[in-house]
């Protein structure tokens, strides 16, 4: 294997208040079992990279949507209510922000990342830097 690409989630950011999120933000306080499984996925990939000296790239997806999406997600609920002429319930006075990513864009991004493994870089301290870190 030359390059391990794996799916993670924005859920790993847990209760972080600062937005936008950064790959440098702490992700050691998952607030759900789903977030904990994604964080453990990242830790396993990190270990695999160190043990077998191969690059790993984790892609943290944010609210993926598309034609076969989950009906319990907000965007489906909003669309359904709009079609029925019903009121959409808004929280936080409409000040909430959310990133939505269309599934076809996810697929294209994954394929592009799979096509080219990143070059290994070593920092001044001799330790690997991302994506090998």
What do the predicted segments below correspond to?
Residues 1-64, 107, 113-114:
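N-terminal Rossmann-like NAD(P)+-binding domain of SDR-like oxidoreductases, especially those catalyzing
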Residues 4, 88-89:
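A short hydrophobic/small-residue beta-strand
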Residues 12, 69-70, 88:
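Activation segment of protein kinase catalytic domains
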Residues 16, 28, 70, 82-83, ...:
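A generic fold-level signal
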Residues 19-20, 71-79:
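A glycine/serine/threonine-rich, flexible loop-to-helix segment
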Residues 24-26, 60-62, 91-96, 127-130:
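Short linear capping/connector segments at secondary-structure termini
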Residues 31, 61-72, 92-104:
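Glycine-rich "substrate-gating" loop/helix at the edge of Rossmann-like oxidoreductase active sites
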Residues 50, 76-88, 98-133:
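Alpha-helical substrate-binding/gating segment
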């Amino acid at each position: 294997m030359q390059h391990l690409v794996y799916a993670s989630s924005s859920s790993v950011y847990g209760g972080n208040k600062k937005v936008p999120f950064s790959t440098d933000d702490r992700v050691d306080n998952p607030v759900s079992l789903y977030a904990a499984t994604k964080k453990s996925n990242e830790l396993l990939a990190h270990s695999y990279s160190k043990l077998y000296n191969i690059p790993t790239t984790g892609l943290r997806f944010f609210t993926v949507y598309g034609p076969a999406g989950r009906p319990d997600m907000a965007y489906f609920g909003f669309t359904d209510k709009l079609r029925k002429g019903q009121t959409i319930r808004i929280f936080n006075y409409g000040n909430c922000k959310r990133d939505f990513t269309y599934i076809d864009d996810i697929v294209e991004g994954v394929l592009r990342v799979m096509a080219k493994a990143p070059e290994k870089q070593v920092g001044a301290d001799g330790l690997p830097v991302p994506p090998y870190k």
